[in-house]
Amino acid sequence: MDPCECSKTGTCNCGGSCTCKNCSCTTCTKSCCPCCPSGCPKCASGCVCKGKTCDTTCCQ
């Protein structure tokens, strides 16, 4: 299951406790872009959120 359903519903869940709304990700497959740390404009494809944020290696 793709945790990022942004392109379909505008909402998505990642990392279990992280819920993103009105996200604009179109290429993320295992993460929600707004879950990335501050200063991280986009999560890399295949990135998995850890807790409520992606770790910095997810940034691209």
From Swiss-Prot:
The keyword Transmembrane helix does not apply. A divalent metal cation 5 binds at C33, C35, C36, C49. GO terms for molecular function: metal ion binding. Residues 1-28 are annotated as: Beta. Pfam families: Metallothio. A divalent metal cation 7 binds at C49, C54, C58, C59. A divalent metal cation 4 binds at C32, C33, C43, C47. Metallothioneins have a high content of cysteine residues that bind various heavy metals. Belongs to the metallothionein superfamily. Type 1 family. Class I metallothioneins contain 2 metal-binding domains: four divalent ions are chelated within cluster A of the alpha domain and are coordinated via cysteinyl thiolate bridges to 11 cysteine ligands. Cluster B, the corresponding region within the beta domain, can ligate three divalent ions to 9 cysteines. This is Metallothionein. The lineage of its organism: Eukaryota, Metazoa, Chordata, Craniata, Vertebrata. The gene is mt.
